[in-house]
Amino acid sequence: MIGMSGPHPHHCHHHHERDDHESGQMPYGQIDPATDPAGGLGRRTMLAAAGGMLMLAAVPGTARAATAMTAGAASAGAPAVAAPGASRASRISQGTTLVHADLHNHTVMSDGDGSADDAFASMREAGLDVAALTDHATMFAISGLSQSEWRTTGELANAADDPGQFTAIRGFEWSHPLQGHINVWNTSDFADLLRAGSPGSLYRWLVGRPGGLASFNHPGREIGRFDNFSYDASARPQLVGLEMFNRTDDYLFEGWSSRTASPLVACLNAGWRPGLTGVTDEHGTTWGFHEGKGRSGLWVAENTRAAVYEAMAARRCFATRVSGLRLDATANGVRMGGVIGLTSGDVRFQVDLDRGAVWDGKPLRVQVLRPGTSVPTVVDVVDTVSGSVADFTVPLDVADGDWVVLRVSDPELANPTPGPNGHPCNDFGVAYSSPWWLQP
């Protein structure tokens, strides 16, 4: 176990010189705290600052790649960087292909600025393969979805959907001001607060719609934390997501400064079994074009709605906040999101990490996260580089808890929202695998 004195990483067999980042410009659309004139990196400060850097890192695939830059970035002389990204084929698994997805976006049909007519085309142009519109379902149609807007969202998704090339999905965001927000996809109707006034009532509504899938959004932002992640076993198969990256924020230590538990720990310890996701939660008019905001990778049999929903239900996904990243991981040959048949013993992890030539040889770390009481316990830290497969073994025991997650980090940068002093995850989060569960 790694204590608060800091990690002692063991090394994979890759050694490259570290890149020097340009002064004042971090590689994730963030702001370098050393040169930030505001002198701080609060969540809202980061959000406002990130808006000036809308660099698209184009990814390969069927969607047309483009490069966008705001007037603010252009006037500052900031370059528009196109990052081709990694191949969509895993080096360690067969039978699936990587697609890049953003499953949480807003329009003027709730509290967004942009017309829903433009959203899917923008996301496809930006290089996404899978996209969803998820406007708020609140208490009143004036601030959230109406029945006619729900129908319109479905019509727009059907018009934009291009099986094999681009998957367009209709969803909604159940939005409780105190308990939190939950995205729902693949249902024929939607539930607002008049129909489902609590997380528990929403779970019952969801279970009545067997194809529906849902996600805990920006977990811990609202004080009630989904009734403190109160567990409903009947809804567990359909609660397929926990947002670890929302906008530019890493939610691992959300609430730590006010001494509340990590949402990851609270959710998984409660018994839920979500995959881990990243989303832009876009409220502007440039859907898909924000480098540095969350996004998800899904491993699909094909790029269709049915295959996307299958991958979500299997938790065969990862969270990141960089475009073009490929992350695949296995534990004793089991892909992320799966069950490892083990009581105790050594578990061999293989981690395929790549972002193409733009990150070739870039130093990264893989942290092995296990249950803790308020923050995850880090039982190993492995140095690796982009473009390689990390291969390492860690002893695990179900007596210490039934889940394990891999966090990929950039050791050169600090986590703007850190946890306890000396915690190994106080570096900059790049990606999270979905969990595995130990099940004897």
Regions found by a protein language model. Name each.
Residues 1-41, 52-58, 67:
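N-terminal secretory signal peptides
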Residues 22, 30-33, 72-74, 78-84, ...:
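Intrinsically disordered, low-complexity polar segments enriched in Ser/Thr/Pro and acidic
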Residues 39, 61-91:
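C-terminal segment of N-terminal export signals and the immediately downstream linker at the start
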Residues 41-47:
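N-terminal export leaders
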Residues 47-49, 64:
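Hydrophobic single-pass membrane-targeting/anchoring helices
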Residues 59-60, 323:
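Ubiquitous "structural anchor" signal
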Residues 77-440:
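Extended, charged catalytic domains and RNA/DNA-binding interfaces, predominantly
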